[in-house]
Design a protein with these regions (language model features):
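Short, charged surface segments at domain edges that flank catalytic/cofactor-binding sites
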Residues: 1-31, 88, 95-108
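Short, contiguous, helix-prone interaction/anchoring segments in small proteins
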Residues: 23-28, 32-38, 120-122
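Histidine-centered nuclease catalytic patch
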Residues: 32-62, 71-83
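Intrinsic disorder/low-complexity signal
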Residues: 4, 10, 43, 122-124
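A detector for short metal-coordination/catalytic motifs
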Residues: 58-59, 69-132
Length: 132
């Protein structure tokens, strides 16, 4: 049997692939909210879907339920600048994430929070965390 003859679960069940992608985004950031640093329980669309935002790695960030709910359908950077917990280093991390530079985003998050934990496997460029 050749590798081309194999059938993978991801090919048969798109929901499984989507679930794996969501988990990888949380894992990539150490399961912390990109906005406030609290544990992330959800995925937030930086550019909301209601405004044409897509479910891509570059547009989806890990967020706690509080930040995700408060942001609602606003543009993330505009909303974030008005928050009491605003940190310019996190704002730069969000911008780097949007531009697809996940490595820089993680470095900026580490700078913003020295206790930020990241898997050594996540020091790569993030290309393995792309939505299909």
């Amino acid at each position: 049997m050749h590798i081309n003859d194999a059938v993978f679960l991801e090919d048969l069940c798109p929901k499984f692939r989507f679930r794996q992608w969501r988990k990888s985004i949380h894992k990539f950031t150490g399961k912390s909210c990109i906005y406030c640093g609290n544990p992330s329980e959800s995925i937030d669309h930086v550019l909301p879907r209601s405004q044409g935002g897509l479910s891509t790695t570059e547009n989806c960030v890990p967020a706690c339920l509080s930040c995700n709910g408060a942001k609602s359908d606003e543009n993330a950077l505009y909303w974030y600048r008005r928050q009491k917990f605003y940190d310019p280093r996190r704002a730069m991390a969000i911008r780097a994430w949007l531009e697809g530079d996940l490595r820089l985003a993680i470095r900026l998050l580490q700078w913003a929070n020295p206790n930020f934990q990241v898997n050594k496997n996540n020091e790569k460029d993030g290309s393995e965390y792309r939505a299909a």
